[in-house]
């Protein structure tokens, strides 16, 4: 493998990974809003679990979401002078906020990488072309579809195990397990809430990634056709110049 080929393969991998990160981040954002959270809490019977009225559930949830997304991450929430979260739960939510912040920081970097890859493809340096850039996007999006479907199958078969593995990857052991009978955090966001939200996020990822792969495939083919046409025109012009006899002086 020559140096140019290795660089192209590396570029394809970087673009593919960046595409997967950006699509995933875009799919997560809609589910961080109070409208979805309220809808899903209604479906999973949060008022019955907490023993609170719907307005009280909304007050507590909105405060938690505000500290999670906007900050500061104090997570000091009260309902009828009752402190909703314990010290351990507040510490866990600060950890959650740190994971989200890191994820979206990486997503922002991935956007910059994609923009840079397309800018470089316009320069045609190191053999990196616009066709390569679109191919990387298509590979990343298609791979994300396959990965999401596979993860979805695993989650449907063993959601609790998948949930545990996910938490072990990002959180210290023992900091994220709370008693559903007494923990308001678990009652506000029960397992059914997370399982249904995970399905919705996964479905949106598949839709966005599938559309991205389709668009990237079309753009890549169009770029290849345009490049071939331009190359053919240039070759034809050169042939005509060679075949034309020089004028007699």
Task: Please identify what each model-predicted range represents.
Residues 69-109, 191-201:
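Individual transmembrane alpha-helix segments
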Residues 174-227, 246-249:
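Terminal transmembrane helical module of multi-pass membrane proteins
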Residues 154-180:
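Juxtamembrane non-transmembrane "cap" segments at the membrane-aqueous interface
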Residues 38-83:
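Membrane-interface interhelical loops and short interface/amphipathic helices
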Residues 1-8, 220-249:
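Actinobacteria-biased recognition of intrinsically disordered, low-complexity terminal regions
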Residues 111-159, 211-227:
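Juxtamembrane interface at the cytosolic side of transmembrane helices
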Residues 1-37:
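Hydrophobic secretory-pathway targeting helix
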Residues 19-29, 54-62, 139-164:
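Hydrophobic alpha-helical membrane-insertion segments
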């Amino acid at each position: 493998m020559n140096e140019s080929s290795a660089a192209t393969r590396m570029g394809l991998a970087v673009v593919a990974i960046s595409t997967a990160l950006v699509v995933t981040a875009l799919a997560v954002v809609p589910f961080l809003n109070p409208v979805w959270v309220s809808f899903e809490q209604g479906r999973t019977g949060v008022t019955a679990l907490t023993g609170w009225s719907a307005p009280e559930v909304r007050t507590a949830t909105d405060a938690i979401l505000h500290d999670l997304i906007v900050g500061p991450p104090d997570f000091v929430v009260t309902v009828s002078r009752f402190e909703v979260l314990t010290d351990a739960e507040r510490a866990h939510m600060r950890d959650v906020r740190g994971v989200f912040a890191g994820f979206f920081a990486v997503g922002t970097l991935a956007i910059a990488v994609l923009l840079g890859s397309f800018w470089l493809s316009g320069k045609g340096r190191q053999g990196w072309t616009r066709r390569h850039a679109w191919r990387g996007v298509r590979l990343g999006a298609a791979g994300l579809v396959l990965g999401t479907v596979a993860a979805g199958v695993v989650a449907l078969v063993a959601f609790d195990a998948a949930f545990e593995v996910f938490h072990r990857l990002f959180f210290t052991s023992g900091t994220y397990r709370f008693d559903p009978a007494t923990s308001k955090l678990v009652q506000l966001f029960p397992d059914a809430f997370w399982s249904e939200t995970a399905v919705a996020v996964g479905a949106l990822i598949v839709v966005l990634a599938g559309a991205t792969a389709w668009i990237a495939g079309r753009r890549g083919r169009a770029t290849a056709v345009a490049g071939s046409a331009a190359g053919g025109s240039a070759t034809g012009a050169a042939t005509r110049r060679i075949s034309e006899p020089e004028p007699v002086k």
